[in-house]
């Protein structure tokens, strides 16, 4: 006997009376297993890989990277979700793909219920590609990728002291080819 209360297992054991008054399902000859977690997927952010309008896995035309949230492109009604659920997968860890940077963006964790609120942990991790394609985006070698990653961490550590100390908040640093905002101080000749 297995008793579920509010979506969680409350009792497992031989006492059938524990389920008295509850909806019962005869599991004779059936398997009962814990839900499977798919630890690296793109389920819900791509419907048809070759069709750009249904593919939110990467943003190759932007200089944003770590700020990108894969959850902003999540479709809980994607056709891949019920198929995945039928196979016993109850949770998916969804990672973005790298586009113009080895830092692809922020991934999330979702259940496979198909409900609008199925994202259980948004911004769960930052996906960084340190493999061959990430190395290519960072300058052509893994040492270049590691140097870029160390630089990104140094920028993140130094950001509060550099930009919050003056409490201005309107300077947007960019280590890309195209700065997103420039601010000139008082008395600037430009």
Show which residues each predicted segment covers.
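Glycine-rich loops and low-complexity Gly/Arg-rich segments
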Residues: 9-11, 29, 49-51, 60-64, ...
């Amino acid at each position: 006997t297995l008793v579920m209360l509010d979506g969680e297992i409350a009792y497992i054991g031989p006492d059938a009376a524990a389920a008295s008054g509850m909806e019962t399902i005869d599991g004779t000859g059936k398997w009962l297993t814990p839900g499977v977690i798919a630890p690296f997927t793109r389920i819900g952010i791509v419907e048809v890989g070759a069709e750009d309008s249904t593919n939110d896995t990467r943003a190759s035309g932007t200089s944003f990277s770590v700020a990108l949230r894969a959850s902003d492109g999540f479709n809980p009604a994607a056709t891949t979700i019920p198929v995945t659920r039928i196979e016993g997968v109850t949770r998916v860890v969804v990672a973005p793909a790298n586009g113009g940077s080895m830092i692809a963006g922020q991934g999330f964790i979702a259940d496979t219920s198909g409900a609008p609120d199925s994202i259980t942990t948004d911004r769960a991790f930052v996906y960084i590609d340190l493999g061959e394609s990430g190395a290519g985006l960072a300058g052509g070698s893994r040492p270049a990728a590691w140097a870029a990653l160390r630089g990104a961490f140094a920028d993140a550590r130094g950001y509060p002291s550099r930009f919050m100390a003056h409490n201005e908040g309107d300077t947007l640093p960019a280590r890309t080819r195209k700065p997103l905002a420039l601010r000139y101080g008082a008395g600037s000749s430009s």
